[in-house]
Swiss-Prot record:
Organism field: Staphylococcus epidermidis (strain ATCC 35984 / DSM 28319 / BCRC 17069 / CCUG 31568 / BM 3577 / RP62A)
Gene3D superfamilies named among the record's database cross-references: Aldolase class I
Record's keyword terms, sorted: Glycolysis, Lyase, Schiff base
Keyword Nucleotide-binding in record: no
HAMAP family: FBP_aldolase_1 (MF_00729)
Top EC group: lyase
Catalysed transformations (reactions): beta-D-fructose 1,6-bisphosphate = D-glyceraldehyde 3-phosphate + dihydroxyacetone phosphate
This protein's name: Fructose-bisphosphate aldolase class 1
Length: 296
């Protein structure tokens, strides 16, 4: 593990850019960027277009390491190059800590939750991540209803994978998303917090994780998770809120920082001039940074 990057992730001021839309969500991400499905004829072309979009984001002067601590990448992005360097090296050289999305998507809903599908090639992926100088990983589950068994299963699966990831020298971001429209969202979050606390308490002193959570209904609910000795940082997802709404809610939560995807890229368009693009990205970065750093 890179100690300088760990120090930046633990104490740095800023947020994490989530650039990890995978195969399933790529057409939607491209469409929002202004690239329609008739502009590519196969998956390779689609992934090239999305890589071009991400390259435009990370090479922009607005994508500044003074405000962006880290970036989460999709596997395809990790294996591609930006300006002649693997993406992870490009980011690290720029001062942005690289993470890799390692999950294979969600299983069918059961007990009010969606566990992660099996990650059969996790070992090989983590070896490649180390070769590519990746600092940490991210994996997402989804909680839709108040079901204690389901929530327990989600957290147990996350920590089971997290321990394997830690053993490879990487820092896992554990992401048990709570659907923002869940009927008992506030209650779900209390159960989730208790289960996460159990998982954290089961770790050895040197086993470090990060948490990526939905912004809680009750402000500062997760503050003591952020203070847990095994937690590097707690970040939050935008989860379907608009950027303004997500920023507003985030400001009420001390110590939590953003890890936004759609809310970061929502004003970016393929048709923008470089100047327009940099300004739109800069405005988004500034507002998300402000919500992550300057609290109410």
């Amino acid at each position: 593990m890179n100690k300088e990057q760990l120090e930046k992730m633990t104490h740095g001021k800023g947020f994490i850019a989530a650039l990890d839309q995978s195969g399933g969500s790529t057409p939607k991400a491209l469409k929002e960027y202004g690239v329609n499905e008739d502009q590519y004829s196969n998956e390779d072309e689609m992934f090239q277009l999305v890589h071009d979009m991400r390259t435009r984001v990370v090479t922009s002067p607005s994508f500044s390491p003074d405000k962006i601590l880290g970036a989460i990448l999709f596997e395809q992005t990790m294996d591609r190059e930006v300006e002649g360097k693997y993406t992870g090296d490009y980011l690290a050289d720029k001062g942005v800590v690289p993470f890799l999305k390692v999950d294979k998507g969600l299983a069918e809903e059961k007990n009010g939750v969606q566990l992660m599908k099996p990650i059969d090639d996790l070992d090989a992926t983590l070896n490649r991540a180390n070769e590519r100088h990746i600092f940490g990983t991210k994996m997402r589950s989804n909680i839709l209803e108040l079901n204690e068994q389901g929530i327990k299963d989600v957290v147990e699966q996350q920590f089971e994978f997290a321990k394997k990831i830690i053993a490879k020298g990487l820092v896992p971001i554990i992401e048990p998303e709570v659907n923002i429209n869940a009927k008992d969202k506030s209650e779900i979050e209390k159960v989730l917090k208790a289960e996460i606390k159990k998982g954290l308490d089961s770790l050895n002193d040197d086993q470090l994780v990060m948490l990526k959570l939905t912004i809680p209904t009750e402000a500062n609910l997760y503050k003591d998770l952020a203070d847990h000795p095994n937690v590097v940082r707690v970040v939050v997802l935008s989860g379907g809120y608009s950027r303004d709404e997500a920023n507003k809610l985030l400001k009420d939560n001390d110590e939590l920082i953003a890890s936004f995807s759609r809310a970061l890229a929502s004003d970016l368009r393929a048709s923008q001039s470089q100047e327009e693009f940099d300004k739109a990205l800069g405005d988004a970065v500034d507002s998300i940074y402000d919500a992550s750093v300057n609290k109410n």
